[in-house]
Amino acid sequence: MTLFLIDTSAWLFNFPPRVVPEIRERIVELAKKDLAGITSPILFELLQGARSGQEYHRLLQHLLSLHQFPVTASDWLKAAQWAQRLRVRGLKAKTVDFLIAYKAMRHRLVLLHADGDFDRMARLVPLKVESCLKFVRAP
């Protein structure tokens, strides 16, 4: 059973007004099969975007039903060291993306995303990814 960490970049296409049916179906499929996971930075990014208190609580309830991969102090330090090595090799990405990728690698999760930075990381390190970019980029 392979678990997935669903990045914010994929989640955004699960919610109106930006729904992409293929991405939404994949997220729903993973959740129904109990294969979907989340980590605290993604939880934060999604919850802070709620448009009302009611939406916040509904979203929180749903997200907390997923497999949880909290970030520890040790994770921050190890992810920073890992990111530094990748930056020296020329890879540029947002700090939080390095942390999320590190969590996925550490727990051997497949990272479902719509962010090209993760594909670039996966070319350099043993990060397993499933890209949704083909569904959101114009041909």
What are these regions (language model features)?
Residues 45, 74-78, 134-139:
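A short acidic, often aromatic-flanked loop/helix-cap motif at beta-alpha or helix-coil junctions
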Residues 24, 39, 43, 56-59, ...:
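A general structural signal for well-ordered alpha-helical segments in protein cores
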Residues 2-3, 101, 105-139:
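Acidic, PIN/NYN-like endoribonuclease modules and their adjacent C-terminal/linker elements
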Residues 53-57, 86-87, 128-132:
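Short, hinge-like loop/turn segments at secondary-structure boundaries
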Residues 1-38, 48-61, 136-139:
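Short, well-structured N-terminal submotif of metal-dependent ribonuclease cores
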Residues 32-34, 62-66, 89, 107, ...:
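Structured helix-beta-strand junction loops
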Residues 11-12, 43-46, 118:
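A generic structural signal for short hydrophobic patches within well-formed alpha-helices
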